C-alpha cells in the first residue's frame, strides 16, 4: 500500500484572521459586518452610559438656556436623557476636535451626535451580520429583512427627521421622558395621528401582538401529550426531535370553528411568514411616514371641515385634536419662539388709521 503525504501550505496571518472572522464555529459569529459593528456599538453604548450619568447641561435650543439631562445634574431614570446636539450646531458634523474645548463640545451636545451616528452604523452592521451568517449557513435571508424594520425606524427618528428639520436638536432625545416629549411635539407639529402611514404602523404593532398571542396560545393549547399530570408539559419536548410537538390539525380545526374556516391557516410555512410580515410591513410604513413628515408632508387636516347652513363651524374630533396640537405647540421651546408656527403663519390684520 502506498501512502501519499502532502505538505500543508502554511496560511498567512491575514488568512488565519479571515478564517477566524468568517468561521461559523465561533461561539459568537463575528463576520465582516461584525468587525465594524463591535467597535461602533461599544462606542455608542459607552458614551451613552457616561453621558446619561454625568454629562453637563446642553444648550439644545441654541439660546443660552442649557437643559439638564444626566443623573448627576438632578435627574432620575425616568426624567434623564442624553440631550440632542444644540440648534446652534444644526446639521454640522461635530466631533470633539471641531470644538474649541471639551467643555464647549459638551455644552453644545456633542455626545448626542457621537452616540447616534455610531449607533446607526452599528445597527446597520448588525443587520448585515444577520444576512452574512444566514448566507454562511445556507439559510434564507429573511431574518435580516425583518430586522430592517426597527433599523428603518431608528434611522427615521435619529437621522432623517433631523435632516428634514435642519438640525440634530430636533432628533429624539435618548431617554424615557425625552422620547415622550419627542412624540408630543411631533404630534403638535405634524399631526402624526392623522397620517395613514402611522395608522398602518399601529395596525402592524397591535396586530402583530394579537397574532403572536393567538399563535402562542393555540400551539400551547394543542401540544401532543408526552408527560404525566405531575410533570411540566415542557418536559415533553427534546431539542432537535423530528416529531411535531403540537397538532396543527387540531389548532386549525379549533380556530376555524371559532371564527370561520378560511380565517385559519392550514400551512405552517405561510402562517409563520404572515406572523413575520405583518408587523415588519407596518413598521416600514411608520418609518416612511416619519421620513415624509420630516420634510413637512404632514398628516391629514380636516379642521373646520363641517359647517352648518349659516357657515358656522360644527366641531369634529379633528378640531378637538387641532386645539390639542396648538396647546402642545405653545408649550414646547417656550423661550425659543414668540409664537408657535401655526399662529405666526397667519397674516396679521391690517389696521386703519
Curated annotation (Swiss-Prot):
Belongs to the reaction center PufL/M/PsbA/D family. [CaMn4O5] cluster binds at residues 170, 189, 332-333, 342, 344. Tyr-161 forms a radical intermediate that is referred to as redox-active TyrZ, YZ or Y-Z. The keyword Oxidoreductase applies. It comes from Lemna minor (Common duckweed). It comes from the Eukaryota. 2 of the reaction center chlorophylls (ChlD1 and ChlD2) are entirely coordinated by water. This is Photosystem II protein D1. Its EC number is 1.10.3.9. GO terms for molecular function: chlorophyll binding; electron transporter, transferring electrons within the cyclic electron transport pathway of photosynthesis activity; iron ion binding; oxidoreductase activity, acting on diphenols and related substances as donors, oxygen as acceptor; oxygen evolving activity. InterPro entries: D1/D2 (IPR055266), Photo_II_D1/D2_sf (IPR036854), Photo_RC_L/M (IPR000484), Photo_RC_L/M_CS (IPR055265), PSII_D1 (IPR005867).
Amino acid at each position: 500500500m502506498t501512502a501519499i503525504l502532502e505538505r500543508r501550505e502554511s496560511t498567512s496571518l491575514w488568512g488565519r484572521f479571515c478564517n477566524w472572522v468568517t468561521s461559523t464555529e465561533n461561539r459568537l459569529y463575528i463576520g465582516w459586518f461584525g468587525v465594524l459593528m463591535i467597535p461602533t456599538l461599544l462606542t455608542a453604548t459607552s458614551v451613552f452610559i457616561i453621558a446619561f450619568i454625568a454629562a453637563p447641561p446642553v444648550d439644545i435650543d441654541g439660546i443660552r438656556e442649557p437643559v439638564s439631562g444626566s443623573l448627576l445634574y438632578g435627574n432620575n431614570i425616568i426624567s434623564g436623557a442624553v440631550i440632542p446636539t444644540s440648534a446652534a450646531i444644526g446639521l454640522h458634523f461635530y466631533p470633539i476636535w471641531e470644538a474649541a474645548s471639551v467643555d464647549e463640545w459638551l455644552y453644545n451636545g456633542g455626545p448626542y451626535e457621537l452616540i447616534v451616528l455610531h449607533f446607526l452604523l452599528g445597527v446597520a452592521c448588525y443587520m448585515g451580520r444577520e444576512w452574512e451568517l444566514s448566507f454562511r449557513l445556507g439559510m434564507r435571508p429573511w431574518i435580516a429583512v425583518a430586522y430592517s424594520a426597527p433599523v428603518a425606524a431608528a434611522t427615521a427618528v435619529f437621522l432623517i427627521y433631523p435632516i428634514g428639520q435642519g438640525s440634530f436638536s430636533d432628533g429624539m432625545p435618548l431617554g424615557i421622558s425625552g422620547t415622550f416629549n419627542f412624540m408630543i411635539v411631533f404630534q403638535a407639529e405634524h399631526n402624526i395621528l392623522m397620517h395613514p402611514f402611522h395608522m398602518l404602523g399601529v395596525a402592524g404593532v397591535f396586530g402583530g401582538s394579537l397574532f403572536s398571542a393567538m399563535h402562542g396560545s393555540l400551539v400551547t393549547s394543542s401540544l401532543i401529550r408526552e408527560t404525566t399530570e405531575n410533570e411540566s408539559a415542557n418536559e415533553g419536548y427534546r431539542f432537535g426531535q423530528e416529531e411535531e410537538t403540537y397538532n396543527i390539525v387540531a389548532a386549525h380545526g379549533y380556530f376555524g370553528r371559532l371564527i370561520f374556516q378560511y380565517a385559519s391557516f392550514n400551512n405552517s410555512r405561510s402562517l409563520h411568514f404572515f406572523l413575520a410580515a405583518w408587523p415588519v410591513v407596518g413598521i416600514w410604513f411608520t418609518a416612511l411616514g416619519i421620513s415624509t413628515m420630516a420634510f413637512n408632508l404632514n398628516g391629514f387636516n380636516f379642521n373646520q371641515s363641517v359647517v352648518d347652513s349659516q357657515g358656522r363651524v360644527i366641531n369634529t374630533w379633528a378640531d378637538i385634536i387641532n386645539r390639542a396640537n396648538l396647546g402642545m405647540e405653545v408649550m414646547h421651546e417656550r423661550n425659543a419662539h414668540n409664537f408657535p408656527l401655526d399662529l405666526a403663519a397667519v397674516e396679521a390684520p391690517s389696521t386703519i388709521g
